[in-house]
């Protein structure tokens, strides 16, 4: 994050030094992507670096969340899109709001049966209000385990506009067998996959309609 912030750039080199010193104390590191592996090598890490296999990462299980079956039961006779993430994070919150107003409302006009399900902890009040005011937008909040929703929905989406690093949720979607439409930010660091469609944000809605057709 510091490398992308104008105000924090001056301390970026110092942070990199601290990270490199910490890494040198480790004999082995499991990286989330080949991109992360390359970054470690560029930092002169001399230990063993392994890249985690697709599917070993898993996030989103919440013991007191809504049973995912309650969400999936409502999928019948609809075209369903899934967005999943920790909704308190700014990049998730603002990216899905952008998606709703600049993509979803447009594609809903062409296909009134499209529904958007937003899963994940701590949705902000603004997002909850949008979910109440805009038809076909469902802000479910925390769920027991999103995997079944990934499997049963027509598409999963990762329309992230900013944020750094590999998105474990996208790896989890793919492992569940979902077809995923993502921006370059949403797919950052993820190896090519036959079910991962990476598009410019201006083409996001077009790709969704194409895949649903």
Q: What is the role of each PLM region?
A:
Residues 27, 151-165, 176-179:
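Acidic donor-binding loop of glycosyltransferase active sites
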Residues 42, 52-135, 139-151:
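Conserved catalytic-core segment of nucleotide-activated headgroup transferases in glycan assembly
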Residues 1-17, 76, 185:
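Acceptor-binding helix/loop patch of EC 2.4 sugar-transfer enzymes
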Residues 184-198:
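Short acidic/histidine- and often glycine-rich active-site loop of Leloir-type glycosyltransferases
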Residues 8-16, 20, 24-71:
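Donor nucleotide-sugar binding/catalytic pocket of nucleotide-sugar-dependent glycosyltransferases
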Residues 35-39, 123-124, 186-187:
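Alpha-helix capping/helix-boundary segments
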């Amino acid at each position: 994050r510091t490398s992308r912030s104008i105000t924090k750039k001056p301390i970026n080199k110092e942070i990199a030094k601290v990270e490199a010193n910490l890494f040198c104390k480790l004999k082995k590191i499991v990286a989330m992507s080949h991109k992360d592996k390359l970054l470690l090598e560029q930092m002169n890490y001399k230990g063993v670096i392994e890249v985690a296999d697709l599917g070993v990462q898993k996030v989103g299980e919440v013991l007191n969340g809504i049973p995912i079956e309650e969400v999936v039961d409502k999928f019948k006779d609809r075209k369903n899109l899934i967005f999943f993430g920790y909704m308190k994070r700014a990049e998730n919150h603002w990216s899905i709001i952008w998606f709703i107003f600049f993509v979803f409302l447009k594609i809903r006009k062409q296909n009134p049966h499209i529904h958007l399900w937003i899963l994940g902890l701590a949705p902000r009040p603004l997002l909850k209000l949008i979910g109440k005011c805009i038809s076909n937008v469902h802000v479910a909040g925390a769920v027991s385990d999103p995997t079944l929703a990934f499997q049963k929905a027509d598409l999963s989406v990762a329309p992230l506009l900013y944020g750094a690093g590999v998105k474990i949720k996208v790896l989890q979607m793919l492992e569940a067998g979902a077809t995923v439409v993502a921006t370059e930010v949403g797919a950052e660091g993820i190896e090519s996959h036959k079910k991962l469609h990476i598009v410019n944000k201006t083409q996001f809605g077009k790709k969704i309609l194409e895949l649903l057709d």
